[in-house]
Regions:
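Rossmann-like NAD(P)(H) cofactor-binding subdomain of soluble oxidoreductases
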Residues: 1-59, 77
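NAD(P)-dependent Rossmann-like dehydrogenase/reductase catalytic/cofactor-binding core
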Residues: 104, 111-112, 117, 139-239
Length: 239
């Protein structure tokens, strides 16, 4: 979309990306792509975190994050957008916040898989171990691994892993049950990008790999789950 618009005509503007994802084929972050297409006088910021439009419309509040490489712009956006409906926090890690926000959609699909095979009780383990592997990736990419435990990833799980509004969770469950699903599930494309990053940075992403195998390699979901449970024993917080 940015490539099609006359973005170079913009000068001295702030572009806020209210989306979560990574570029297929490269794993590149959206802010980096936007920055490469915009004139250097512009500033890119990201608006990330949990929340569904349906709930905001009903007056249900939530917390979110705004991040940018420009601290002054970031502070201005947080101060101007904060309200009784959304409490914003200042982000401090573009890599971790963007990668974490994108990866949570893949975890959402995995949650749908668990619902589809009637093993929803494993969602606690999925949340814990999924966060751990995303933290490893963020660290390898030069970000702060603690970002995986913040609002942009772990903090967004309720809206993705459990919510009836989650397109990714619904897609995962429908996929397992061989039912048609016609809404956008961003995690379907994001998992491809994560496989690129996994290879590039040499990081283990067993849950993301299992999701990829089921979606793209027609792997058996129960067999993939069994393989995850049979992985070598280790301490919970080993790298």
């Amino acid at each position: 979309l940015l490539a099609e618009a006359p973005m170079q005509a913009l000068r001295n503007k702030t572009v806020v990306l209210c989306m979560k994802g990574l570029e297929m084929g490269t794993g590149e972050r959206l802010s980096v792509i936007a920055g490469s297409l915009l004139h250097e006088s512009n500033t890119v910021a990201v608006w990330l975190g949990p929340g569904h439009v349906q709930e905001f419309y009903r007056g249900i509040p939530n917390c979110m994050v705004i991040d940018s490489g420009n601290d002054a712009v970031k502070r201005r956006l947080v101060q101007e957008f904060s309200s009784d409906l959304i409490r914003f926090y200042y982000g401090g890690d573009m890599i971790g916040n963007e990668v974490g926000a994108a990866a949570k959609n893949v975890v959402g699909i995995a949650a749908g898989f668990l619902d589809g095979v009637e093993m929803s009780s494993l969602k606690g383990a999925l949340m814990s171990r999924g966060t751990r592997e995303v933290a490893r990736l963020i660290k390898a990419m030069g970000g702060n691994e603690l970002s995986a435990y913040g609002l942009c990833h772990l903090g967004d799980y309720e809206a993705t892993v459990f919510s009836p509004y989650s397109h990714n969770r619904q897609f995962g469950e429908s996929f397992i049950r061989h039912q048609d699903y016609h809404r956008l599930a961003e995690g379907y494309y994001t998992v491809e990008a994560l496989m690129v990053l996994r290879e590039k940075y040499g990081v283990e992403l067993p849950i993301c790999m299992a999701v990829h195998n089921i979606l793209y390699e027609s792997a058996d979901p129960r067999a993939e789950l069994s393989a995850l449970l049979r992985r070598g024993l280790r301490a919970e917080f080993d790298d």
